[in-house]
Amino acid sequence: MSSVPPVLSGSEIRSKFLEFFNQRQHPILPSASLVPEDPTVLLTIAGMLPFKPIFLGQQDAPSPRATTSQKCIRTNDIENVGRTARHHTFFEMLGNFSFGDYFKEQAIAWAWELSTEVFQLDPKNIVVSVFREDDEAFEIWRDKVGVNPKRIIRMGEEDNFWKSGPTGPCGPCSELYYDFKPELGDDNIDLEDDTRFIEYYNLVFMQYNRDAEGHLTPLQNKNIDTGMGLERMAQILQQVPNNYETDLIFPIIETAAKAAGIHYEKADEKTKVSLKVIGDHVRSVVHMIADGITASNTDRGYVLRRLIRRVVRHGRLIGIDGNFINQVAETAIQLSEAAYPNTRERESFIKQELEREENNFLKTLERGEKLLADIIAKEEKQISGVDAFTLFDTFGFPFELTQEIAEENGLTVDAEGYQAEMKKQQERSKAAHETIDLTVQGSLDELAEHIHPTAFLGYTDLQSQVKIEAVLVDGHRVETAEAGVVVQLICNQTPFYAESGGQIGDRGYFSGDQLVVRINDVQKESGFFVHHGKVERGSLTVGDTVNATIDRACRRRAQANHTATHLLQAALKNIVDDSISQAGSLVDFDRLRFDFNCPRALTAAELTQIEAQINTWIAEAHEGQVAVMPIAEAKAKGAVAMFGEKYGEEVRVVDFPGVSMELCGGTHVKNTAEIGLFKIISETGISSGIRRIEAVAGPAVLEYLKVRDQVVKDLGDKFKAKPEEITERVENIQAELRNTQKELEKVKAELAIAKSEALVSQAETVGEFQILVENMGDLDAKALQTAAERLQQKLGEAAVVLGSTPEDGKVSLVAAFSEGIYKGKKVQAGKFIGGIAKLCGGGGGGRPNLAQAGGRDASKLPEALHTAKQQLRETLG
């Protein structure tokens, strides 16, 4: 029998890995975004991807070594998600990297040390593979590490020659597998047997670059790239049957199960697959949106949309009819926020995007499912290309989703027919633009063949006459729209500002004879300003000339916030660090947000100084100037540009002399005095090295202060205190609560001791030891531990195992063993109680003499305690 490794949480595994390599001169670097800088891939698919330019010699390494926990997304095996024990779309890759520093022998030695000493895997449970031609790696494993040659398996290029993609860095690799059944022996080892083996660590010896023709060129430096799947190591150390039942994912599954009114443990296999799909995909979409990806019909936005729609559909399959995705998203955020704070900081944006996509799909899902049911009922073997295209074009079913549903029902889909229908639509568009099925997103380029891009008049005009060039309803081009219809309008010219540069689009209305169209958003697509609105009165026809009028109050507020954003950047440069640059922004009607690069949080004093500086500039009434000039001239004058932004030869410069000068296409106040007031609401970190300030300006400051004043008044009324006395009153209440909590804990401890005193006489003698196994009712975990320790001390050479159910459905377990048991009999409390906890659907561990564990199924506690007693009798007798 091989020894059992300690039970560690996913967070502990991540920390131990990073700490191990940090102690060996590997700086811990933050995870890169899921949106890669590499243009050859849509998403970050591997831990090494952020280092690809270094491996290629295109960039210098920040240090010769590094270690990371990298967020990754892969969807190439999406059909296996939930059906196998370890396929995921989102996963974390723990990695250690060497950039021309150490190589094969050191990488192998550290991998073995980490596995056997830090994670305490029994060497009997480890099998390694090497590339069939890599004799050097084979010899290191055999001669330096001491692995039995029978447990070193030579594999072909497909398995053990790693590459990041069709092109790029690559090299032979050596993989470490965990063997769940070492008792089966070393003869005829088949690493493809995933019921016995799981690959958990891959060591890539990066030596080559593969070009588009497949040629291998030696890299300038030999590098090391490794990857340990966090979810896989969690499965091993938490001793659960699959990655999904680890603490990294299972709480999400439990939330989904609760929303569906089902119990995971009692569910059939089909239901469990759906729950696992939801658990996996929700992790993916939360992190994708947190990293700035939004749903669309192209590229990574399409990947996001597809994942969200799979979540919604699998929710339907397990009986969830309405909205639920944000319930499970909240659990995913709770699980990730400690390691990835941007998930909590962008919570509002994440949930808005998820709810929008969920609602959009729910609108058409039922009708699409009915069409699919009708098709399946025909008992034909294949869904036609026409039907598949209808499902995509009319009901928003991604083609892959139709394929998946078809497969579940034993059908195939005519992919060629689907592509033919797609091609026909494109040809119809070219032949007669009047009959184009024109979607707002992705098809506006076709309009450019017939009309000119929209001319923007809004820098000088707040109202103008415009000609309606196109009317779209539900993304399709129509001639006329009647009252009550939601429309997207394209005009020859417009005073409406379209959302760009962080500034929100204008609001307002179109009017004419008996016509009113309320405009609530304006977006810029392919050179056209797309006005989103609703016909409130009358009707609208292509070719009509109407009056376009923006909401002046909204424009003034947006202008004030946009200019305030410029002043904020100037103040940050003046007060904190001149090297600060913009990383993103939002200019809304009632608030502003500014993201900037800074390695630390700003102090309260700095924030006060920044706010005071901006309000001083406002009071000084600086006149603004706007000019268009060559970009070289603008930069020579010191105009600030946004890092990474692409500019044309001619740029628009917004200048408040002596205060701020920036390249900007937005709308601004003519004088800083028009802003009125500026107030910082918060300063937070959104990712490594990026900070965010949220603020209000103009009338929004008074609204904000009014709300704050009301809060203070309400608190004063509740505490019967003056505003200046509230802080002291709250501190007094907190002190009282702390004292009460201490008293409560003291009472609980006394109760635990009293209960333990009464149990001493119930101990059973087994050989030279006493054993006591009892159910302690609803005693909490801390009191349970106190009771176990007290009983073991009273009984002397004894094994005490106590269980309780302090929360609805939850289990607490404690084991306290004397020295004669954990040293003399080699029975350790941590390993023992961890095994017992598994019977309750949980896990845990601790020291040899004292350990705690938990479980998810309270109904199994009596059985678990009975098993504990039987095992102790057998072991100690």
Swiss-Prot record:
<dbReference type="Pfam" id="PF01411">
    <property type="entry name" value="tRNA-synt_2c"/>
</dbReference>
<dbReference type="Pfam" id="PF07973">
    <property type="entry name" value="tRNA_SAD"/>
</dbReference>
<dbReference type="GO" id="GO:0004813">
    <property type="term" value="F:alanine-tRNA ligase activity"/>
</dbReference>
<keyword id="KW-0648">Protein biosynthesis</keyword>
<dbReference type="InterPro" id="IPR018165">
    <property type="entry name" value="Ala-tRNA-synth_IIc_core"/>
</dbReference>
<dbReference type="InterPro" id="IPR023033">
    <property type="entry name" value="Ala_tRNA_ligase_euk/bac"/>
</dbReference>
<keyword id="KW-0030">Aminoacyl-tRNA synthetase</keyword>
<dbReference type="InterPro" id="IPR050058">
    <property type="entry name" value="Ala-tRNA_ligase"/>
</dbReference>
<comment type="similarity">
    <text>Belongs to the class-II aminoacyl-tRNA synthetase family.</text>
</comment>
<keyword id="KW-0436">Ligase</keyword>
<dbReference type="InterPro" id="IPR009000">
    <property type="entry name" value="Transl_B-barrel_sf"/>
</dbReference>
<dbReference type="GO" id="GO:0002161">
    <property type="term" value="F:aminoacyl-tRNA deacylase activity"/>
</dbReference>
<dbReference type="GO" id="GO:0006419">
    <property type="term" value="P:alanyl-tRNA aminoacylation"/>
</dbReference>
<dbReference type="GO" id="GO:0008270">
    <property type="term" value="F:zinc ion binding"/>
</dbReference>
<keyword id="KW-0067">ATP-binding</keyword>
<dbReference type="InterPro" id="IPR003156">
    <property type="entry name" value="DHHA1_dom"/>
</dbReference>
<dbReference type="InterPro" id="IPR018164">
    <property type="entry name" value="Ala-tRNA-synth_IIc_N"/>
</dbReference>
<dbReference type="GO" id="GO:0005829">
    <property type="term" value="C:cytosol"/>
</dbReference>
<protein>
    <recommendedName>
        <fullName>Alanine--tRNA ligase</fullName>
        <ecNumber>6.1.1.7</ecNumber>
    </recommendedName>
</protein>
<keyword id="KW-0547">Nucleotide-binding</keyword>
<keyword id="KW-0862">Zinc</keyword>
<feature type="binding site">
    <location>
        <position position="664"/>
    </location>
    <ligand>
        <name>Zn(2+)</name>
    </ligand>
</feature>
<keyword id="KW-0820">tRNA-binding</keyword>
<dbReference type="InterPro" id="IPR045864">
    <property type="entry name" value="aa-tRNA-synth_II/BPL/LPL"/>
</dbReference>
<keyword id="KW-0694">RNA-binding</keyword>
<dbReference type="InterPro" id="IPR012947">
    <property type="entry name" value="tRNA_SAD"/>
</dbReference>
<dbReference type="Pfam" id="PF02272">
    <property type="entry name" value="DHHA1"/>
</dbReference>
<comment type="function">
    <text>Catalyzes the attachment of alanine to tRNA(Ala) in a two-step reaction: alanine is first activated by ATP to form Ala-AMP and then transferred to the acceptor end of tRNA(Ala). Also edits incorrectly charged Ser-tRNA(Ala) and Gly-tRNA(Ala) via its editing domain.</text>
</comment>
<feature type="binding site">
    <location>
        <position position="562"/>
    </location>
    <ligand>
        <name>Zn(2+)</name>
    </ligand>
</feature>
<feature type="binding site">
    <location>
        <position position="566"/>
    </location>
    <ligand>
        <name>Zn(2+)</name>
    </ligand>
</feature>
<dbReference type="InterPro" id="IPR002318">
    <property type="entry name" value="Ala-tRNA-lgiase_IIc"/>
</dbReference>
<dbReference type="GO" id="GO:0000049">
    <property type="term" value="F:tRNA binding"/>
</dbReference>
<feature type="binding site">
    <location>
        <position position="668"/>
    </location>
    <ligand>
        <name>Zn(2+)</name>
    </ligand>
</feature>
<dbReference type="GO" id="GO:0005524">
    <property type="term" value="F:ATP binding"/>
</dbReference>
<dbReference type="InterPro" id="IPR018162">
    <property type="entry name" value="Ala-tRNA-ligase_IIc_anticod-bd"/>
</dbReference>
<keyword id="KW-0479">Metal-binding</keyword>
<keyword id="KW-0963">Cytoplasm</keyword>
<dbReference type="InterPro" id="IPR018163">
    <property type="entry name" value="Thr/Ala-tRNA-synth_IIc_edit"/>
</dbReference>
